Amino acid sequence: VRENKLNECYIRPIVFLGHNQMGLNPNGVNIRVAIAAWPWGAYLGDDGINKGIRVRVSSFTRHHVNITMTRAKACGYYVNSILAKAEAVHDGYDESILLDPQGYVSEGSGENIFLLSKGRLKTPALSCSNLEGITRDSVFEICKHLKVEVEEGFITRDELYIADEVFLTGTAAEITPIREIDNRKIGNGKRGKITARIQKIFFEIVRGNHIKFKKWLTEV
């Protein structure tokens, strides 16, 4: 961040195999690390942060856990995400939601997902082919602070449709409300109260304005 003279930015570390060997066997191949940083606004738009986004359930599904190491954040897996995202944008939506091979809700194309129903906040269990996101974990801690209980488990597609609130979490997406899924309005079609409370504290934390979570930050 300092090297690139940036104030607010996105940081992407990448670990990859070197050039000293061809083939599919990684043993003995040099490991390289690159870190990129660049200015980047709200991934799903400022309006998305404030008013919520429109999403669709993708025709593509997340990988089965026996196909690959689904809990790893590996570049090759993102072909699945690219297909889902491109399909959603082509059809006029902002983002997609993918189901797991059993038909349960997994995550967004690059984000974890939470829903609020009858006062209970729920998110898919990590057995649903989803990533154990850092922002997902951060929301757990924020919810403890707010005394909001979070339940991990299996979520069906129709639970999304009848939820009071739904939001996405991610390093790029931050906390982004969902106002519509498959042309069905979520709640009152606006950012929900619980989502707004979580979002407010999250942005206070990342900007260094929340004393309780100061330990999460590294000053530059």
Language-model-detected regions and their locations in the chain:
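Short, glycine/charge-rich beta-strand/loop segments that flank catalytic centers
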Residues: 1, 8-22
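Compositionally biased, intrinsically disordered low-complexity regions used as flexible
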Residues: 3-4, 59
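Helix-start/capping segments and mature chain N-termini
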Residues: 16, 22-220
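Generic structural signal for well-ordered alpha-helical scaffold segments
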Residues: 1-2, 85
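Short secondary-structure junction motifs
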Residues: 6-10, 93-94
